[in-house]
UniProtKB/Swiss-Prot annotation:
One of its GO terms (molecular function) is sucrose-phosphate synthase activity. Expressed in germinating seeds. Coiled coil: none annotated. One of its GO terms (biological process) is sucrose biosynthetic process. It comes from Oryza sativa subsp. japonica (Rice). Induction: Circadian-regulated, with the highest expression 1 hour after the beginning of dark period (in 14 hours light/10 hours dark cycle). Keywords: Glycosyltransferase, Transferase. Residues 29-41, 49-58 have a biased composition (Basic and acidic residues). Plays a role in photosynthetic sucrose synthesis by catalyzing the rate-limiting step of sucrose biosynthesis from UDP-glucose and fructose- 6-phosphate. Involved in the regulation of carbon partitioning in the leaves of plants. May regulate the synthesis of sucrose and therefore play a major role as a limiting factor in the export of photoassimilates out of the leaf. Plays a role for sucrose availability that is essential for plant growth and fiber elongation. Disulfide bonds: none annotated. This is Probable sucrose-phosphate synthase 5. Homodimer or homotetramer. It catalyses: beta-D-fructose 6-phosphate + UDP-alpha-D-glucose = sucrose 6(F)-phosphate + UDP + H(+).
Amino acid sequence: MVHHYSMSCPDLEAIEQVEWEFSRQLSRRRLEQELGSREAAADLSELSEGEKDGKPDTHPPPAAAAAEAAADDGGGGDHQQQQQQPPPHQLSRFARINSDPRIVSDEEEEVTTDRNLYIVLISIHGLVRGENMELGRDSDTGGQVKYVVELARALAATPGVHRVDLLTRQISCPDVDWTYGEPVEMLTVPAADADDEDGGGGSSGGAYIVRLPCGPRDKYLPKESLWPHIPEFVDRALAHVTNVARALGEQLSPPPPSDGAGAAAQAVWPYVIHGHYADAAEVAALLASALNVPMVMTGHSLGRNKLEQLLKLGRMPRAEIQGTYKIARRIEAEETGLDAADMVVTSTKQEIEEQWGLYDGFDLKVERKLRVRRRRGVSCLGRYMPRMVVIPPGMDFSYVDTQDLAADGAGGAGDAADLQLLINPNKAKKPLPPIWSEVLRFFTNPHKPMILALSRPDPKKNVTTLLKAYGESRHLRELANLTLILGNRDDIEEMSGGAATVLTAVLKLIDRYDLYGQVAYPKHHKQTDVPHIYRLAAKTKGVFINPALVEPFGLTIIEAAAYGLPVVATKNGGPVDILKVLSNGLLVDPHDAAAITAALLSLLADKSRWSECRRSGLRNIHRFSWPHHCRLYLSHVAASCDHPAPHQLLRVPPSPSSSSAAAAAAGGGGAAASSEPLSDSLRDLSLRISVDAASPDLSAGDSAAAILDALRRRRSTDRPAASSAARAIGFAPGRRQSLLVVAIDCYGDDGKPNVEQLKKVVELAMSAGDGDDAGGRGYVLSTGMTIPEAVDALRACGADPAGFDALICSSGAEICYPWKGEQLAADEEYAGHVAFRWPGDHVRSAVPRLGKADGAQEADLAVDAAACSVHCHAYAAKDASKVKKVDWIRQALRMRGFRCNLVYTRACTRLNVVPLSASRPRALRYLSIQWGIDLSKVAVLVGEKGDTDRERLLPGLHRTVILPGMVAAGSEELLRDEDGFTTEDVVAMDSPNIVTLADGQDIAAAAADLLKAI
């Protein structure tokens, strides 16, 4: 607080400039949000004639009433029924995979146990393991790690749940323990599975941590550096989930004998995919979109809230905040999660109203109107808001010793005796937890009540304000000791910047107020020590305090209550709702040191109040048990993810095995092995091991390699003999072992296809793809052009469209297969896939109105009817300076409840608006799933510039080859504003999967050499 007096005038002026800029931006943003909210609310308030007559076109499903009741109780909205559905014949072939609406709620008396649900949880950053969690080691390894691990265990123990996978990043780094490099860690195996002796698949159940590599494998990256590697994680997660789903299907629902030996089992796809924090929310959104399964997200802490706090402090300009925290990238990931989420789990109503309300993709007033229309069964006019539900976090009470708890804090002889044993040299009479002596050695008088604070050393945890409150209150110092458990440390100078700053400030404050002998700050503790620390505080009749500036969950408050500790907690975030339930403490303003002091004194000095808070916490703590949490969670998922469309799993065509692949898997067993199914033992083990098939250095041994080979045999396909006529083989799914994707956007300045450049690209691709395995390689054209435009462009180049396995057109809105014949119809199954949440004609008129820049004329952005299709609204843009950028238009549409992808193509002369699930990268993943092609066997050719979605084509598990000099004009200038994130936050250009060919290099030869790798 003294720093401002030493600042120079330029420094003060800079701070004032930051504060003014923040105020201006905040006011402008809130005005835009209010305009969007009013417009959406006005449209939704209007009822059509049919709706006024009470004759809606659709009806809510049976679970709607329960969902609405739960939404009202939880402060969130209900899931809106989707109005834009594909034709019935499309739905019957490719319907969205939906959660079973019959899963029981928390209030029902009986629980059915024959569901065999598969649930996927995702938490990428930090150090995640099941035992000896290093909580507090760094800012990325905190309460979220403990929460997701315990959630995985608890869900796996819930009746009806067969398997839970917790996906996280694999870290093979000498700076961290070797366990973080293990591909799979088993968390639990249900007792019923352990007793299963028939080998029918019981061993596949339980909870597992599955670690997938992404980014540099020898580095432990902070979460701010993980963003460019998200696509690689998604691709590996997609492969893992697909393999597990198919193997589970073979075990749990094998085809009946009447279907024949070659029949494929029905895959057991995830019941829900749940992303935790912004990075995992983006992964979950992309994964759920690719698999067409429900998606749930939990924010844990939110980027917009953090941005506002940082800007209010006025110490960092927005550009510095972006560079340090990658905050714009984080916010966009959270918005992406809101676009795709069926449900958002929150810890408090305050989080819904004050934190999620800051986002473009959620407006409480609009959501409520959509909920009303849902109840009436009327159209939501293409608008969507995710359902927000409040589910209090759970806690594992298995570590709580009820006998000790009955004695702790009672003030009897037992408490005094335990403490006396630690002070008396003769301690052999009773073994006590070692952490007790480690803490009490700091105190001159260890008999005093203990104020306990337990958190990682993070500025947001606000420990320095607590120390100031303690140091400045003589009465508080005389009455109690203070214990600070701030993670683990060896040398402060070797710690990360934020943690080192906090710990240094703590030591300085202890010295300033001369608190030696009154404050404990041990360097190390184990996770198993934490219960003993709570018990010690309770024995001294102490108080637990959480003074965080904002606390999303407040798990430590629940833990403290479970051990009989009254609490003082921040009034910002989760503690508000927790204390409403537990009634075991007081809320304070974390910025007010005097209020913190008064609250602590109130509980420590008034023993009757202390006892009342203790009893109340113990009496109500069952409301936060994991079984209660999981039952409530599953009932909310069932209500939120219920859709009226027919339910049918994603079609995965069976693939015949080749004799060569089978022989390799069987160790040279010959052709006879090709038709043999996986043995039970291999099938069981395959569900427990997730190894990168393209990375032998990650192999878990010969057995793992054999399992991977067996899995590969199950989904591999016939390898045609190499010959000059190899391409004459049918293009049916399963015929290709690799794909070469031409995604170079060859346009002139006028937006027309540059035939000369496109011809070079096509000839290069075809010549590079020739080789010994030419018959096993397929070709795909991926473009922003329509299907007729793409076909005409290929023919103008002298290329036969039928030489391509697939054409991805209209920026991913359509896929067609030219080898099927002259009728180049779009893939109806893919159309059904992308139709989910498509606003259709409701958004068509909104885009030109919102997309034109100030002063632009109506003709500057007008509907291009010839380029439109069922799932693509195309608009002709006359002048790039007269239209707004993609990010701005998407933001405006989100504020009005419309969920779309937008792409400027054809050198900024056309804007394609396509469904949320449609894009060129997502269409490629769709083909890889449908055709059973490993993404590591895919190569994508791109130019140095291109459409605004070009940067999304680069990253992933596939090989990307950037060809110079092939594109005359791109559209990237209309992607985002300068104050947003950059391409470096989307794609790691130094990835070994991305190769940029140099000018003057023999491109054809170099490309051919690169393609040999796939």
